[in-house]
């Protein structure tokens, strides 16, 4: 890829005119930091548009080359401008969230196009609408906007504004021309399947809009907001989305909308009016039985008032018998007088239906699910109490269990040893172990244990009562029982699972989703351009100043990196960004940019989203300034970047970009 160097001669709203070292004039995309007289280095990707490059090779002496080239440029520029102005018939501004200005001739062919904000530049570069018919140019712009995610839901509204060049047309021609343009705009929007608003404008308002760096449509809404006392300043008018500013100001009186002009909307509007109840029964009756009297229908249909006026005049007595079938309650009232006819709406049986729904609380017996507490018999731990008999010794009243041992009918002499098992009756299923004492008849010296009932826990110590036949040693382990109680409390630690419910906090109501794609998807690039959309999918508002988003990449040979936010739906001034070098690099990530929000960013409510368009790169690259020799050659290899998405040109769910709230990871997978 070839590189050029040159000097910036002039800055315009969206481009910079540069004189190269080879004495060629080129137009570059305007970027932050550009200044007149500045030396810059650039390549073909930085050109404003390949079709707009104007080259003039110098054939004069080097010492006068600059002046001569500038003179040629000015002469041709003014000549072209004169020709262009003579053809300018009308001006069309399109606000999607990118804003684009088009100039057309009388045949509705686009003769000029320019971006009104930074987001519009790539769209215009791809669409190249110049010399296209207006319909084709707008269709292509809308298609590209959909592909790039600017039109991605039914909530998006496209705002068109148009004005006629008053210097070329008289009033009647202007009126006719604006109507033809509006018709074209409607056709384009409807064929593209988008919602739209069209605001006709004047040449005077267009000039005022240009002075404020606004499209005609946004300026008209701003003026309306000022008139109505709505809180909408110029900054908001520039940066808020079309849907947001339309939500603040009612433009219905001076804009043309795609809202269908159906009369079907009127009944909904007239429902609150008192005559309406009389209208609704009449509508239900008329379609069914008045087919034989079509003459009366048009008389009554114009307005509810005229309809009720006609009710008494054509005594509907012949039709009443017919209507009495389907609606006996309403027609008798209509028979007598129109006042009672309005009252006939009162018997709306829907109230009865509402009452019928009240029995639904019968479903409240769901509390019967409380038996779920039957899970409380978690004595599943009771099988574990094979060791729990030891605690049985803890209630040292070994003598007291003896009376309990009497029920153990197996061998009354042995019950002395059984007292140790007497605690087992607490877990009645355990008595199955009692048959083992039957093998103990061998110790005929059972009377000796009478003196040492406390030592009887020894069988529990062995944990296998089969060894109990050796009670001869029962005298020595007298000290052992004292140890066993010490271990017995250990099982009480089993309740430790209680902490598990701790995680169930209101935090779990906070849920987010991140979608992303990369605007530049080539492997090698001078700057990274991730586009990110953060959506609150939970039930609680999220304080944006507590949110951090991390995009991971390898810096390769690039140095002096900076982050810049080109655009956000909450304004770029509320977005922050820091480039961080990782202390523990990974194979595909040794750095990340951490994107955050200022305190003024406010909160992200459930269902809302924040969209961010960013760039990361060398500080000279982002401003197109000439870098020092040490930074001359630099490129990112995006294929080695962890967060790079080369598979999509639109927003998709992406978990290789992480999101943290108050330092806790809420979304994504770290590298």
UniProtKB/Swiss-Prot annotation:
The chain crosses the membrane at residues 58-78. Keywords: Calcium, Cell membrane, Membrane, Metal-binding, Transmembrane, Transmembrane helix. It is a single-pass membrane protein. Residues 380-400, 426-446, 492-502 have a biased composition (Pro residues). Residues 4-51 form the RsgI N-terminal anti-sigma domain. It comes from the Bacteria. Residues 359-379, 401-425, 447-491 have a biased composition (Low complexity). Residues 290-323, 359-505 are annotated as: Disordered. Gene3D superfamilies: Endoglucanase-like (2.60.40.710). One of its GO terms (molecular function) is metal ion binding. Residues 79-671 are extracellular. Residues 1-57 are cytoplasmic. One of its GO terms (biological process) is carbohydrate metabolic process. It is found in: Cell membrane. Ca(2+) binds at residues 554, 556, 637, 640-641. Residues 508-671 form the CBM3 domain. PROSITE patterns: CBM3, RSGI_N. One of its GO terms (cellular component) is plasma membrane. Anti-sigma factor for SigI2. Negatively regulates SigI2 activity through direct interaction. Binding of the polysaccharide substrate to the extracellular C-terminal sensing domain of RsgI2 may induce a conformational change in its N-terminal cytoplasmic region, leading to the release and activation of SigI2. Interacts (via RsgI N-terminal anti-sigma domain) with SigI2. This is Anti-sigma-I factor RsgI2. The gene is rsgI2.
